[in-house]
Amino acid sequence: MIQIVCILGSSWGATRWSRKGLAIALVAILPIIGTIMMLTVPRQHKGVLLFGYYLVSCLAAITPLIYTWHVQNTAGDTKKKCTSAMVFIGMCTGNVIGPLLYSVDDAPLYRPGLISNLVMFALVAIIALLIPMYLALLNKRHAKRREELGKSAIRIDESMLKKKEMTQKGVEMEAQDQRQEQDNGFSDLTDMKNEDFIYVY
């Protein structure tokens, strides 16, 4: 139940504020806190330890955000399939390695495994905050390229817009009678080569 609430809540937040990287980083804070609790709280405080364990289980919300984020930030049929395969292989590798970090010799505290997880959660949070900066740089490069080609530098990413915003944008487009000439938005180009591609933060 906790995982379901966390998945739905983080997905709603990522859509509401159009920031998937920030959503991943915020979700990663919960298992970080939970892991620290499990490492530091004395064993006799069972309720607190259980609460820490529940916080760690919130990591399940990170997976769907990563899957949707990488798909939105990849263009080109072949590249998208290869990227999806790499992400899937990476997650499967993590699922294989994860249990091996916990040994019966480390019972009952399992400190090496918990410390490894703590480092991993911290890295996820840091990387999720750094990636949007890189994506913003790529968006600026694309905007500059559009200007060089005589196109409008400003593009609106419609993938994260709400229904009301989409309707309003449609009305504005009709009122201005704008037409996009040579728009590569639906071309089978990779995101790096397609100047009309917009990266999602």
Short names for language-model regions:
Residues A60-G76, S84, G98:
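Intracellular juxtamembrane helix-capping segments at the cytosolic ends
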Residues G13-A14, L101-L109:
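Interfacial helix-cap and linker-helix signal at transmembrane-aqueous boundaries
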Residues P42-R43, W69-K81, A107-P108:
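Paired intracellular helix-loop junctions of major facilitator superfamily
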Residues A25-Q44, S57:
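C-terminal ends and interior cores of transmembrane alpha-helices
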Residues S10, A28, I32-T35, F51-Y53, ...:
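A generic transmembrane-helix signature of 12-TM secondary carrier transporters
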Residues T40-F51, I62, Y134-L135:
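Helix-loop junctions at membrane interfaces in 12-TM secondary transporters
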Residues V5-K20:
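Helix-to-loop junctions at the C-terminal end of transmembrane segments
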Residues R111-Y201:
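Intracellular terminal tails of multi-pass secondary transporters
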